[in-house]
Every structure is written in C-alpha cells, then in structure tokens.
C-alpha cells in the first residue's frame, strides 16, 4: 500500500508548484508519504452521481481517489463567501476538473456538495483550525482575516457531523446557515443535528467564537467601483469580489486606475455612455447573462465567469486582459465518452 498526499490548487495555480512553494510536498515526504499527487495530473474516471440534485450528468473524478483503500481529508478551517464554511464536505470541490468545479458554482453549490458526498466520502476528516480564516475566505487577502490564536483540531469519521461541529465552533447555526449540512442529513449521508453528535474532548462552548462572515456584494466597496447589476447569481458575484478584494486590500496595486465599471446579470440596464479607456478606466462585462453588452468593454464570459479572479488587470490593455482571462481557463481533458459543458469562446 502507498500513502499519497493529493491536492488541487485554485484557478491559475499549478498544484505541483504549490507543493514546492508552500513546503507541503517536502513535509509530506518527511512524514512518510510515498508520493505527492497534483490531482489535475491524475487519470479521470467518469462517474454517475446517484439520485443527483444538480450534477445530472456524469462527473470525471480522480482514479486515485476513487480506488483508494482509505480517504483522509485534511481541510483548513475557513469561512467561504459562497457556502459560509469550507471544511470536510467542501473538500470534494477539489476533486473535480475545472469545468465541473466552475459549473454549479453559485446558489446551487450546497446541493452540489451533497451530490459529491454520494460518490466521494472520506473515511476520516481532520480539520486544521490552528490558524483558521474568517471573513473573505477561502483566500482572503486581508491580514485581519487570519486568526492566529485559535489552535483547534477537529476530527471524526462522519464528514457531516465534523462540519456541523466545525460550523458551530465558528459561530454559525449549522442547520440554518449551512444548507449543505441539512441537505446531507436529509439524504442520509450523515448527522447534522448537534444533539445527536458525541463530541469528545474540549467542550464546544470553550472554543466557540464568532467568525466574521464573507461578503460577495459589490455595492459601495470603493469610490472608484461602479456596478450595473441585473439578476446576477452568486457565482459571478463571488469570483468578481474575490478578484476585487486583492485591490481593496492593497490599494497601491490600482492607484493609477480611476474607474472600474461592472456590467453583470440578466435584464440589466446600462447607460449609453460608459468610461472604458484602459489603463485609466475599465468596463468589465461579467458572465454569459450579460453577453449582449460584450462590445461595451472587456467581456469575461462563463457561467460562472471566473471574472476578476487572477485577471490582474491594472496597467493592461483590453486585449491583454482578455488574453490572460482565456489563458486562465482550464484545458479540456480528453476522456472518452465524457461530454464537457459548452463554453463561450
């Protein structure tokens, strides 16, 4: 048997490089692992989700995970702007290729995680709450969002119970604020009732703390930001706010930009005159729902659009922003019999 430490990084990041830069790869080998595995390099197996709520077509999952004798998840305790928490259940998002990861990356994310637990279920979940993240997680650029005095480790065999206890420790009402937990319980995948969970060790009340919630709203975030927003789902809002937070937390990175305008969502009304004059000012048309306005600025297509996430637009021309955006989109993996979602080119 082998001990394999596997992971998949976020958009625009190479997991193999991340293993080297953050030291996890070297630490894993020192600790007795046989190898580390960037999941984007693993062979994919097409799997049907039983009784799906949102993943109605097959998903392609890493063969190594599907065939493992034991799966141990080691999530970092973090607030997530879309799902409130990202603990054991949310780890399954990292098993997906980027097409499936971005798909259903909005209001249906909770149901998606319930579906994923039906095909990938950890035998043990160990939550690292030593230095957890609050606020604009899962990758907040704000230093104050990193909590450096928490020092909690949480572990259990039932990922739903682990997440329920974890959410409670973070100050959430698990059943009412984290729909994936009650969804998993209703589906018979675990226990989300705190009264039915045997918590061993330090009592919850001794470590419980209110973690600041994340926020994906774009209204009033900065005087230079203007938003024309119709019916916009959480996916495009999440990716837009994620990228924008980098500049809100580090104003010097866009000090030469005078105006940033976003057009997004269905049925949005837009003025006849917009100020798109890079690198002084930019208009971003975000997501497929706003495609009718794509000639008004830089069009960032997709559902959800990955929008400002790693776009790094200040100082770039429209053409340079578009090129970087498309280069960040994942290449299709050639899997026989696997039909990928259509993407806007």
Predicted regions and their residues:
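N-terminal and secondary-structure boundary signal
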Residues: 1-345
């Amino acid at each position: 048997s082998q001990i394999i430490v596997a992971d998949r990084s976020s958009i625009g990041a190479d997991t193999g490089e991340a293993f080297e830069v953050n030291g996890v790869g070297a630490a894993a080998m020192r600790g007795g692992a046989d190898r580390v595995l960037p999941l984007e390099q693993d062979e994919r197996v097409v799997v049907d989700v039983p009784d799906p709520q949102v993943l109605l077509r097959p998903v392609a999952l890493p063969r190594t995970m599907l065939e493992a004798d034991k799966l141990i998840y080691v999530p970092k305790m973090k607030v997530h702007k879309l799902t409130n928490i990202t603990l054991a259940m949310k780890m399954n998002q990292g098993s997906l290729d980027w097409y499936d990861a971005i798909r259903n990356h909005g209001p249906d994310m909770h149901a998606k995680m319930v579906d994923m637990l039906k095909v990938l279920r950890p035998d043990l979940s160990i939550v690292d709450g030593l230095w957890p993240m609050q606020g604009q997680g899962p990758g907040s650029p704000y230093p104050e969002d990193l909590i450096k005095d928490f020092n909690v480790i949480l572990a259990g065999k039932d990922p739903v119970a682990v997440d329920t206890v974890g959410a409670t420790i973070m100050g959430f009402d698990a059943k009412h604020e984290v729909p994936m937990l009650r969804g998993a319980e209703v589906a018979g995948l675990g226990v989300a009732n705190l009264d039915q969970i045997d918590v061993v060790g330090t009592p919850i009340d001794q470590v419980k703390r209110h973690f600041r919630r994340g926020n994906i709203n774009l209204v009033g975030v900065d005087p230079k930001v203007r938003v024309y927003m119709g019916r916009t789902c959480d996916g495009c809002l999440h990716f837009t706010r994620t990228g924008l937070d980098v500049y809100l937390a580090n104003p010097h990175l866009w000090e030469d930009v005078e105006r940033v305008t976003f057009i997004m969502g269905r049925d949005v009304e837009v003025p006849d005159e917009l100020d798109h004059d890079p690198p002084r000012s930019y208009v971003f048309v975000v997501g497929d729902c706003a495609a009718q306005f794509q000639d008004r600025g830089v069009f960032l297509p997709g559902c959800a659009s990955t929008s400002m996430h790693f776009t790094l637009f200040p100082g770039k021309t429209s053409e340079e922003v578009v090129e970087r955006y498309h280069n960040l989109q994942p290449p299709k993996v050639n899997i026989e019999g696997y039909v990928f979602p259509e993407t806007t080119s």
